[in-house]
From Swiss-Prot:
Pfam family, one: Enc34_ssDNA-bd
Domain of life, source organism: Viruses
Protein name: Putative protein p50
Disulfide bonds: none
InterPro entries from the UniProt entry: Enc34_ssDNA-bd, NA-bd_OB-fold
Amino acid sequence: MKIKLNNVRLAFPELFEPTQVSGQGAFKYRANFLIPKSRTDLIEEIKAGIKHVIGEKWGNKDIEKIYNSICNNPNRFCLRDGDSKEYDGYAGNLYLSASNKSRPLVIDRNTSPLTAQDGRPYSGCYVNATVEFYGYDNNGKGVSASLRGVQFFRDGDAFTGGGVASVEEFDDLSMAEEEELLAS
C-alpha cells in the first residue's frame, strides 16, 4: 500500500548512492522521515496503511494481534518512536524508516530531477515522500517501507555532524610567512 508523506523532515538520507548498514547486508538507498507526534492525521493514515498490509499478508482476523506483536520491535516495524534515539530532531517525533535496492525518484519542488551535486534534499530539510508498505516472514513477521520517491519541499536547519570550518576560524598567515622567510 502506497502512502504519501507530506512536509516531513528528512534524516539520514542515502538517496543518490546505495549503502550498507554498519558494513553489512544489501546495498540500499534509504532515509528516515520525521513526523511530529502532533500530526495525528498522518500518523493514523500510516498505521491504517500498515494494518491494511497486515490484513492482506496474513488475513483479516489477526490484524490487531500481529500489529501489536511487531509495533514495538524496531527490527520488525518501520514506524518508530524518535524519543528512543539521541539524534538531532528526533525528540517529540515518530520516524518512518524506508529503503529500496532501486534508486528512488528524487525531484525538486518543480518536479525536475535532482542529483547529489544540487545539495538538495539534505538531512534536516523538509520533503514530500512516497513509500510502499509490505509485510514479510523472515524469522518472524514484520512490516517495512519501500522508498519510492522524495521531493524537496522546503529548507530546514541541517542536521550536521559538526559541519565544515569557515575561513573566519583561521588567521591570515601570509604576512607571517613572508616575515619568517626574510628573517632566515
